[in-house]
Amino acid sequence: MDFSSTRMLAQGLFVFLMLSTMAEATKPRTILVGDSQGWRAGTNYTQWAIQNSPFHINDTLVFKYPPPGNSTVTQSVYLLPNLWSYITCEFRGAKLLGNASEGDDEGFKVALNESKPYYFASAEGNSYDCLAGLTKFIAVPSTRSTTS
């Protein structure tokens, strides 16, 4: 094989690897909220969300937490309707996504199907954690880019 053939082969391999990487980058992610620790009281999920962003349309969040009786603090997950509800930890009008027992085993999944803010929070403990800025976060998925 001469130099030009080797060079063309190397360039072709490079293009293939780049396209493979781009295709991988365009796949929706499944993201465990809180990583290996899961969804638990007293945790700053805003910091977690910053570290795990950007979120993209069709990504899926997985919420896992111990069932009642295995934890000193019961957990739940709500989707709050707007920023004001999120800031004030007002759960009227919120949608319960997962009650105290639904985070067990494999947890439950929430698909981020729209380009809009998703306001997640726990209402447990009279919303103490939420009011302290804990056990809540915002995810704003964007369109996944196919170019670098």
Predicted regions and their residues:
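Beta-strand signatures of extracellular beta-sandwich domains
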Residues: 76-79
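Extracellular/periplasmic metallocenter environments
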Residues: 2-11, 19-40, 47, 68-69, ...
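Loop/turn positions that initiate beta-strands
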Residues: 57-58
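Short beta-strand segments of immunoglobulin-like
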Residues: 44-54
